[in-house]
């Protein structure tokens, strides 16, 4: 700063003694220096005696001043550096002295560049002249103001930023439109064509150039049905839009007022107020539309860290990290799935555990991505997220939800859901509760709603009345019993009664669907309205059975806006899908009948009870049947509109019998094996009727080849199709017409050739009762003469011998009559000397004979020799009813004489023999059937069906004489009971279950069911780890003892 005038006056007083001679001497010295044109160090020092005190700046700050000074001295660079102190004329004396010391140090460093032949002597006059420079002169007093002005001009640029705001405001005011500027006109156009009209006007301007006297066209996305045209006159606008489509030329063109012109293009930007635990949605990238939770905010860098459910394709990631080639095609967006670190390690993906230095939390780092607790922590820009009007659904919140210690879910961050709701949300009289702040959980009623504050009235004493609370700190409050209506969200329009309040979540019993609906308290209002809801969209109504485009099927349980909620036909678990109208293929209206577990017929509207599966114990009428799946309506079931999905074999008809033919167990063994039923007994030997095709047994078909009268033996049997397009399918025979058989498959009824079905048929309950089921009873049947009414003799008297016991061989080796078998042995028990039936009493070794090829004239039934109940003597598979039973308690000798008089196993009189201990079939023998048949063994899971009791599950622990010891419970840890075989049924295993093989070559082996292919199971056997394909009927669920 320049010194004040008072300081100058004091200096003038100190130097009044200086006479005029000194001034003259200085002038003479200057003339001498100019005359020499050279300079030593003394001349350099003298040359700096006089300079313009107000023309130079501080040389230490500005290098340009040094250059100016040096050029004014004839290019003497060294002199300019020696005279740096002369630029500090506006500093105090003390400051000058400090600078002078610094200058001396610089001079010492620059001596190498100065040629100095002389010696500098101290010059007292020079010192006086040096001090004299600071003395102002009267004639230069007026230059102080000029100096101050020049300094301000030079250094004012350093502070120009302080005045930018004021200057900007002025400039903005100057930019506002005035009456001299072009005007803005509103032109009406077709809705949705605003952008198209603007582009057409631009193209028209390009084509016609200056002839189109308009300045600009504006089409705003939020303003429908109008565009803005900037022009000087209305006539110019009319000329521009003349002949254009989508513009209503006959409509009046409106002039926008000048003060409103700026509002057309002004954008109201709201400051984003983000805090932790705020819910946001992603706008771009792989996670577009996904819900995210803010965990950190960096306001300086305008970035946030969010927590997302990962969308990571681990296979593609592993390929990328290994350097393998990745397909460049547009990849599908992976579904959201929590990150499994163990799965990533199995794919040899490198996983590093790192600690965040800011939060101290540990994260798993995979390829630069951070994961914690299965979530993906990602840092994104504020521009890539949406903050306004983010309302998560319950499904999304449950994925982010962490169960508390007591196992109940806590929807954390619910208060942040209400931060972006619309204004006018609360109305006078609404019951509210404070959700955060010092007054949290305070209840009250709304009195008045201001801009951002709500005035509430509370019953708590000592508080202001009314009390002003910020709108973001309030939430609506309801109590159980209130009738409400949903006004926003997924269930908008639904009405119901509040049955439970969980924090700020209401559970409502819907008036239409009678199911529980969860909604936010902020999304409902109290209402007495009861809505019936939409019951039909297009051709589909509520509770219709529909077929979807992916060939799945289900029942419509709810109608939403242009969509349906469909309960799919998956019996294992309830699966609900939201489908569009276009995704439904057709409506299924077929009337199909199926059979329950006990072979009772189930039709629509029949009441059934579920005895197995996740819906066990449910009961109700059948609404739909499709592919063996029942859709049952249970009015006590509050979910899924009351519908339950179950397999028909997991249900029983209410009021139906436990077995179709004989409740006492006459047909109970048909569940365990494919037993053949005996032929009907004729009234007399001559009363047998031949079918029209020459067949026997009152039927045609495979017995005679023609069409018979009466009931066919195939009716009601379960057969397997072995030829044709339906090869491998099984189902019951529902009709026989000549050589065609109608078989009911699970999907439909098909007609196949009679020769295309397998002989391995299973007897169903409504066929004849097996005569081999009673075991050792005395007598087997009540003694009657004859055994059946009006039947004398009981069997065909022309059959000699009457049974196969007089025939050698007794058993079948592919039924080859030329194969001698003495002693007779079963083809699968050749080496078992303990097998029954090897005694001569049963098979007196008669010579081999052609048993089926010598018909006796007049005989209506059997051939001679050796009558048979079975088929003709062609090679075939045959499951004998007399399978070997090597049990120690079955006596083989003595047996019963097989005389032609009667069958030994029937106690009829005359000719009958009592059966004690009996040689009939023991049902609890380890083997009770032919091939592909199932039987009981220890450590297998079974269903227990006792008369008058509900079905229980148990594990067979022991198989003894005629009974089974069963431990209740799926793991066999319950009570132990005794059960008859007719009361037990093997539970079929499912995929991945441990199984036990109960028949065939691998009988008794255990393994794992690794797959199911139709009626076959793929089993990995434990003993040799071989994989075998076995019939599911041979597999039982194994329970480890």
Curated annotation (Swiss-Prot):
Coiled-coil region(s): none
Top-level taxonomic group: Eukaryota
Record key words, sorted: Activator, Nucleus, Phosphoprotein, Repeat, Repressor, Transcription, Transcription regulation
One Pfam match: KOWx_SPT5
Keyword Repeat included in the entry's annotation: yes
Location within or outside the cell: Nucleus
Ranges of biased composition (kind: Gly residues): 691-703
Family matches, as PROSITE patterns: RIBOSOMAL_L24
InterPro entries: KOW (IPR005824), KOW_Spt5_1 (IPR041973), KOW_Spt5_2 (IPR041975), KOW_Spt5_3 (IPR041976), KOW_Spt5_4 (IPR041977), KOW_Spt5_5 (IPR041978), KOW_Spt5_6 (IPR041980), NGN-domain (IPR005100)
Gene Ontology terms: cellular component: nucleus; ribosome
Compositional bias per record (Basic and acidic residues), positions renumbered to this chain: 122-133, 804-814
Sites of Phosphoserine modification: 59
Biased composition (Acidic residues): 7-32, 53-69, 99-114
SMART domains: KOW, NGN
Record-stated family: Belongs to the SPT5 family.
General function of this protein: May regulate transcription elongation by RNA polymerase II. May enhance transcriptional pausing at sites proximal to the promoter, which may in turn facilitate the assembly of an elongation competent RNA polymerase II complex.
Protein name according to UniProt: Putative transcription elongation factor SPT5 homolog 1
């Amino acid at each position: 700063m320049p010194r004040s005038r008072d300081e100058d006056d004091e200096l003038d007083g100190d130097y009044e003694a200086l006479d005029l001679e000194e001034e003259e001497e200085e002038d003479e010295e200057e003339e001498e220096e100019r005359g020499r044109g050279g300079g030593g160090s003394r001349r350099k020092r003298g040359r700096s005696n006089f300079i313009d005190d107000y023309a130079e700046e501080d040389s230490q700050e500005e290098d340009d001043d040094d250059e100016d000074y040096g050029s004014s001295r004839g290019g003497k660079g060294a002199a300019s550096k020696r005279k740096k102190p002369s630029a500090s004329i506006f500093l105090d004396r003390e400051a000058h002295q400090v600078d002078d010391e610094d200058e001396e140090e610089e001079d010492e460093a620059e001596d190498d560049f100065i040629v100095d032949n002389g010696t500098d002597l101290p010059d007292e006059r020079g010192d006086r002249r040096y001090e004299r420079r600071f003395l102002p002169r009267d004639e230069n007093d007026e230059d102080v103001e000029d100096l101050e002005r020049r300094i301000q001009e030079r250094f004012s640029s350093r502070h120009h930023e302080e005045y930018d705001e004021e200057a900007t405001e002025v400039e903005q005011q100057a930019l506002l439109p005035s009456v001299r500027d072009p005007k803005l006109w509103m032109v009406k156009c077709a809705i949705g064509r605003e952008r198209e009209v603007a582009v057409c006007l631009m193209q028209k301007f390009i084509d016609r150039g200056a002839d189109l006297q308009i300045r600009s066209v504006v089409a705003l996305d939020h303003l429908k049905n109008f565009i803005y045209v900037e022009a000087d006159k209305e006539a110019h606008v009319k000329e521009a839009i003349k002949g254009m489509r989508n513009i209503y030329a006959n409509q009046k063109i409106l002039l926008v007022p000048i003060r409103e012109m700026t509002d057309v293009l002004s954008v109201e930007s709201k400051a984003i107020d983000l805090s932790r635990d705020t819910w946001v949605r992603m706008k771009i990238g792989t996670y577009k539309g996904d819900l995210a939770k803010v965990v950190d905010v960096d306001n300086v860098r305008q970035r946030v860290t969010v927590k997302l459910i990962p969308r990571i394709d681990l296979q593609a990631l592993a390929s990328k990290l290994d350097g393998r080639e990745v397909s460049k095609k547009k990849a599908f967006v992976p579904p959201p799935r929590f990150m499994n670190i163990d799965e990533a390690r199995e794919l040899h993906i490198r996983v590093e555990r790192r600690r965040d230095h800011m939060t101290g939390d540990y994260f798993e780092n995979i390829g630069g991505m951070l994961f914690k607790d299965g979530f993906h922590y990602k840092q994104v820009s504020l521009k890539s997220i949406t903050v306004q009007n983010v309302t998560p659904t319950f499904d999304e919140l449950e994925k982010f939800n962490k169960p508390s210690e007591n196992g109940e879910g806590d929807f954390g961050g619910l208060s942040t859901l209400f931060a972006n709701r619309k204004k006018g949300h609360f109305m006078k009289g609404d019951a509210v509760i404070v959700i955060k702040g010092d007054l949290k959980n305070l209840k009250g009623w709304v009195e008045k709603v201001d801009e951002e504050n709500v005035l509430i009235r509370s019953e708590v004493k000592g508080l202001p009345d009314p009390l002003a609370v910020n709108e973001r700190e309030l939430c609506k409050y309801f109590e159980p019993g209130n009738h409400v209506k949903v006004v926003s969200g997924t269930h908008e329009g639904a009405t119901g009664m509040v049955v439970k309040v969980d924090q700020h979540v209401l559970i409502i019993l819907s008036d239409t669907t009678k199911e529980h609906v969860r909604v936010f308290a902020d999304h409902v209002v109290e209402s007495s309205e009861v809505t019936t809801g939409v019951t039909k969209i297009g051709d589909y109504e509520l509770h219709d059975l529909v077929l979807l485009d992916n060939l799945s099927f289900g029942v419509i349980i709810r109608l939403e806006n242009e969509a349906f909620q469909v309960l799919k036909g998956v019996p294992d678990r309830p699966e609900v899908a939201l489908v569009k109208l276009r995704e439904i293929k057709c409506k299924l209206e077929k009337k199909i009948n199926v059979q329950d577990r006990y072979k009772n017929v189930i039709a629509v509207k029949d009441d059934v009870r579920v005895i197995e599966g996740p819906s066990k114990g449910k009961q109700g009428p059948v609404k739909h049947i499709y592919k063996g799946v029942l859709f049952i309506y249970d009015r006590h079931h509050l979910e899924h509109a009351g519908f339950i999905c179950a397999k028909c074999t997991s249900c029983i008809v209410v009021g139906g019998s436990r077995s179709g033919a004989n409740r006492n167990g006459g047909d109970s063994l048909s569940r365990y094996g494919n037993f053949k039923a005996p032929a009907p007994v004729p009234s007399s030997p001559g009363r047998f009727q031949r079918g029209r095709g020459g067949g026997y047994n009152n039927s045609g078909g495979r017995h005679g080849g023609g069409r018979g009268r009466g009931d066919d033996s195939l009716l009601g049997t379960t057969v397997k199709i072995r030829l044709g397009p339906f090869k491998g399918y099984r189902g019951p025979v529902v009709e026989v017409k000549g050589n065609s058989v109608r078989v009911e498959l699970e999907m439909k009824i098909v007609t196949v050739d009679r020769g295309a079905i397998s002989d391995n048929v299973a007897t169903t309950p409504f066929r004849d009762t097996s005569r081999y089921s009673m075991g050792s009873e005395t007598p087997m049947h009540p003694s009657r003469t004859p055994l059946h009414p009006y039947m004398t003799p009981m069997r065909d008297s022309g059959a000699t011998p009457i049974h196969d016991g007089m025939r050698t061989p007794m058993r079948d080796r592919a039924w080859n009559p030329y194969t001698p078998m003495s002693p007779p042995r079963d083809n699968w028990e050749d080496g078992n000397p303990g097998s029954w039936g090897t005694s001569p009493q049963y098979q007196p070794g008669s010579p081999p004979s052609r048993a089926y090829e010598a018909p006796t004239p007049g005989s209506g039934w059997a051939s001679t020799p050796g009558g048979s109940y079975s088929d003709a003597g062609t090679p075939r598979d045959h499951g004998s009813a007399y399978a070997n039973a090597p049990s120690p308690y079955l006596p083989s000798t003595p047996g019963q004489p097989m005389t032609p008089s009667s069958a030994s196993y029937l106690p009829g009189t005359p000719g009958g023999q009592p059966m004690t201990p009996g040689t009939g079939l023991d049902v609890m023998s380890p083997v009770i059937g032919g091939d592909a048949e199932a039987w009981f063994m220890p450590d297998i899971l079974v269903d227990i069906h006792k008369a008058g009791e509900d079905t229980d599950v148990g594990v067979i622990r022991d198989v003894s004489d005629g009974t089974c010891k069963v431990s209740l419970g799926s793991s066999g840890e319950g009570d132990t009971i005794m059960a008859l075989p007719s009361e037990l049924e093997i539970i079929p295993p499912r995929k991945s279950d441990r199984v036990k093989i109960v028949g065939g070559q691998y009988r008794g082996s255990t393994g794992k069911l690794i797959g199911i292919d139709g009626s076959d199971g793929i089993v990995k056997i434990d003993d040799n780890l071989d994989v075998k394909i076995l019939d599911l009927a041979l597999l039982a669920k194994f329970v480890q003892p």
